[in-house]
Amino acid sequence: MPINGSNYKVQNCWTTRVACAVLFLLFTFSWLYWFQADMLAVAQHGLSGGKTHYDRTVGAVISTVVLYLLHLLVYAIVRLTRRSHALTYFPSFLLLAFVSSVSYPFSWGAWLWAAPLLLLLWGGAVWLAKKVDPFANDTKEPIGLFSRRMWLNLLQLIVMMLGVAAVSDTNAVHHFKAHAEVALQHGDADEALRVGERSLETDESLTMLRIFALSQKGELGERLFCYPVVGSHLDVLPLLGSKAQLQLMADTVIWDHFGVRPDSIMERADSMGRARIVGSQLTASQYLDSLECDTLATLAYRDYKLVASLIDRQLDSFALQLPRYYALNDSLPRHYREALVLYQQLHHDAPAPGVPDTLFIYKDSLTTLRWQDFHQYDSIYPRKSERRIRTEKDFRGTYWYYYFSKD
């Protein structure tokens, strides 16, 4: 039975509206629930002063419903039903883009002039569409997904989705940090370590979060350098002089892991006797040193002190501390074995002043053989570019790779 012009118009408009609505709802919910949830949690925590908590499910559902209701309101006003129906979603996408770009501390930035300008351009496009659409003769086109009207509208939606992605914070490290903090806040160290584990991008804050998560699992000396590491000994804790900062997680979670909070440490003179130091003004090294004499402290500080020395490539400091905290046997964590073999090789079996001779009695044949393989790459691959590529492929994740590749 042939479809007359009136029935064709109603059926095709309905099909287009449903398809656009489904695509919009799927994209918006997925974007808010999976991609932006952690960033929104950080932003809401900062903007509310820590008084409110963002729930990814509730937040995604409510936001999606509100944005769709905004679309319905716009549609009721402008009544675009044909090839430009997708334009009725523009205000919703604009609001979604704004929400996705919000960070803490808050700043309007370019939105003060960009949002009014974009709305003005959108208004012009709507006016033009209402003038042009009545003249479009599409009654002979296929109905449904294969119609030109359908694909023109879907294309417009896709362009707006790409616009949302373009103005949102898509920085990988920012998302890694936010997700890691959310995971640690819920006591999930495994998830905090999983996020971004294959990426080479990091910063001081993400390194600090991974150090904390590994310490919780008792694997700090075993796995730290399997991740990219940046910063210095000052950045292993969010204290004085550190570039590493927490955005969402309360710092008390870290201090409870050590058993002693910085603010509870009594005033004490520094090593030169020239200043008095209050707990909240401690550097990471001063805080960790103070824990060694505190009966309430857990043993977590030991690995922190060792990896802090390794991060700074201070092998003498590492060698002095290692025998105090670990028995030199086969149970020594992987990175400590690697650092110890490296120290022995660099000192040619001659200890530096203060380093016990027992450090050179320890032998690990497998680690030593692997070190020899690493060391031979200088002669096997004389070209620096080729050597760098091969070394990264075969030895990334070892302390040796970190030690010799660190700027």
Predicted regions and their residues:
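Membrane-anchoring hydrophobic segments
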Residues: 1-91
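Aromatic-anchored segments of alpha-helical transmembrane domains
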Residues: 27-32, 91-103, 158-164
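Hydrophobic, aromatic-rich alpha-helical transmembrane segments
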Residues: 52-61, 107-115, 146, 150, ...
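Membrane-embedded alpha-helical segments of integral membrane proteins
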Residues: 85-140
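Internal/C-terminal transmembrane anchor helices
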Residues: 144-171
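Soluble catalytic regions of membrane-associated enzymes that act on cell-envelope
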Residues: 169-315, 319-320
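Solvent-exposed soluble domains appended to multi-pass membrane proteins
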Residues: 266-407
